């Protein structure tokens, strides 16, 4: 299951992600963050961390450097 989600993230990055202008306010980008979180923490915690990050990525958040804990 974890590998399926990682593959979907890669599919997003190399297809849809190339069609829309970059707008992530953080470094690493939200898709990279989700990938790193899944690899480092596993499926449940990785998804939780990634979703929290995506919800913080909006115009009213300053963004900046935000590594995977």
UniProtKB/Swiss-Prot annotation:
It is found in: Cell inner membrane. Keywords: Cell inner membrane, Cell membrane, Membrane. Could be involved in insertion of integral membrane proteins into the membrane. GO terms for cellular component: plasma membrane. Belongs to the UPF0161 family. The lineage of its organism: Bacteria, Pseudomonadati, Pseudomonadota, Betaproteobacteria, Nitrosomonadales. Pfam families: YidD (PF01809). Disulfide bonds: none annotated. This is Putative membrane protein insertion efficiency factor.
